[in-house]
């Protein structure tokens, strides 16, 4: 499911919850224990008190950092490139993945003729691909992906290193 579709569904559900107060946009500035509860201070100076804080704010979690919960992890010797492409033809709801010695490559249909390509490889190779102009990247895709993909038009691309990371604690009493 595309991120924007998921976000839209969440916002629509939020609108139907009478007991939900959205504090948006707001950033968490501090988090402190206070009498079997947590006191949160937001960037606008507002303070909140709650018995439960859920840190679901990503790999570089501000909640985890403010709660002084460390992480263990390491970098894999791989990186991943996500490439948004137009295939020029409507896509069926078919996803595929092929495995290569350098890492998997996958096709994820989005909507109409749009799709995401996922390319795992060495960090050096991904940096090389990221530096290519779209026309050159399209030629590399034609060479590296199965022929059934057909020609594509690159519209956006991004990459990130693959990292394994686990919190040292997953529960911290308030």
Where do the language-model regions lie?
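Conserved N-terminal helical subregion
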Residues: 1-66, 74-79
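Conserved FAD-binding catalytic core of PHBH/FMO-like flavoproteins
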Residues: 56-162, 166-167
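Short FAD-binding loop at a beta-strand-to-alpha-helix junction that anchors the flavin cofactor
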Residues: 169-174
């Amino acid at each position: 499911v595309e991120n924007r579709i998921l976000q839209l569904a969440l916002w629509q559900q939020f609108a139907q919850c009478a007991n939900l107060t959205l504090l948006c946009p707001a950033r968490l500035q501090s988090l402190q224990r206070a009498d079997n509860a947590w006191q949160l201070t937001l960037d606008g100076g507002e303070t909140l008190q709650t018995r439960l804080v859920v840190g679901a704010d990503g790999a570089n979690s501000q909640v985890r950092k403010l709660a002084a919960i460390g992480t263990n992890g390491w970098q894999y010797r791989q990186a991943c490139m996500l490439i948004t492409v137009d295939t020029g033809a409507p896509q069926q709801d078919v996803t595929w993945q092929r495995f290569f010695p350098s890492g998997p490559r996958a096709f994820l249909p989005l909507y109409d003729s749009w799709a995401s390509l996922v390319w795992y490889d060495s960090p050096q190779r991904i940096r090389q691909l990221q530096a290519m102009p779209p026309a050159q990247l399209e030629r590399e895709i034609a060479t590296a992906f199965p022929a059934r993909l057909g020609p594509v038009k690159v519209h956006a691309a991004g990459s990130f290193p693959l990292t394994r990371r686990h919190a040292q604690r997953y529960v911290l009493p308030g």
